[in-house]
Design a protein with these regions (language model features):
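A glycine-rich beta-turn/hairpin centered on an aromatic-Pro dipeptide
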Residues: 146-184
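Acidic/His-leaning functional-site neighborhoods
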Residues: 173-210
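Amphipathic alpha-helix face/heptad-repeat signature
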Residues: 6-13, 71-78, 108, 112-115, ...
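C-terminal interaction segments
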Residues: 197-246
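Short, mixed-charge aromatic SLiMs
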Residues: 65-77, 137-151, 231-244
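Non-cleavable N-terminal signal-anchor transmembrane helices
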Residues: 1-27
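Hydrophobic/aromatic-rich structural module bridging two neighboring secondary-structure elements via a short loop
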Residues: 57-112
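Short, contiguous alpha-helical
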Residues: 15, 23-62, 100-157, 212
Length: 246
């Protein structure tokens, strides 16, 4: 996906999120049990402001976090600020990020597009409305991001965050497959490795890219995808994803 496409997806999902959450401010968010719709709107507003300030300052903003009187107003204002920072910069410009291999504005552009589509799903779940399909290119990019940058990188850089779950892994492999793209996820006891392509595996997660992305982010149940093979390793992947994406 190119920069223009990320911005296009970011805007579409922001507009959908804001419209849906406006009618669900007091509703619980099933995928984020401690939150209401208002909490969701405030969280996304805070994320947008944090990333805009990180790019503007060249450092993590401090003091943090802010407080908002009206989450919907803050959401709109901070979305405009975030997009303003993106359009003022090239994707290849330097920016501090939490992902060591990519210290660029482009990292945040991709991350905010993916952040927004997941929280758009949360808003739809809170409102009890059918979710808008996730475009295939955005969903496949999101699968790659969450497997490589959240799961694999997270398990390597912050293994302590995975507690006893990581040492229990024994090297078995799960294939994540959308038909057009596939990833091999090896659950090792010291790190999780992710590669594109095919190899031998003990289990698989198969489905449309939209469904697979939602399953990996725990925004869909098992019946949204086809699970095949060793149930233990599938459950282990599910548990590891819950930690990686919390």
């Amino acid at each position: 996906m190119d920069d223009e496409r990320f911005l296009e997806c970011l805007d579409a999902d922001y507009q959908r999120l804001r419209a849906v959450v406006a009618d669900a401010l007091t509703a619980p968010v099933p995928s984020c049990p401690a939150w209401t719709g208002a909490d969701l709107a405030a969280h996304v507003a805070e994320v947008y402001l944090h990333k805009a300030e990180t790019m503007r300052l060249g450092n993590w903003p401090s003091p943090w976090p802010p407080t908002f009187d009206d989450p919907l107003v803050a959401l709109a204002e901070n979305y405009r600020g975030l997009v303003g920072e993106f359009v003022a910069r090239d994707a290849g410009d330097h920016s501090l990020t939490w992902y060591g291999p990519d210290q660029t504005v482009g990292f945040w552009l991709r991350r905010m597009a993916q952040e927004t589509v997941i929280h758009r799903l949360d808003a739809e779940l809170a409102a009890g409305v059918q979710h808008d399909p996730i475009p295939t290119d955005l969903a496949e990019d999101g699968i790659d991001e969450v497997l490589v940058r959240f799961l694999a990188f997270g398990s390597t850089e912050y293994p302590e965050d995975f507690g006893e779950q990581l040492p229990e892994c024994d090297g078995r492999t799960v294939r994540v497959d959308t038909g057009a793209a596939g990833w091999q996820v090896r659950l090792g006891p010291t790190a999780i490795m992710v590669e594109r392509g095919q190899s031998d595996q003990e289990a698989g997660v198969f489905g449309e890219a939209d469904a697979v992305l939602r399953w990996l982010w725990r925004r869909a149940d098992d019946d949204a995808v086809r699970l095949d093979g060793d149930r233990w390793v599938l459950d282990k992947l599910r548990a590891m994803m819950a930690i990686a994406t919390q």
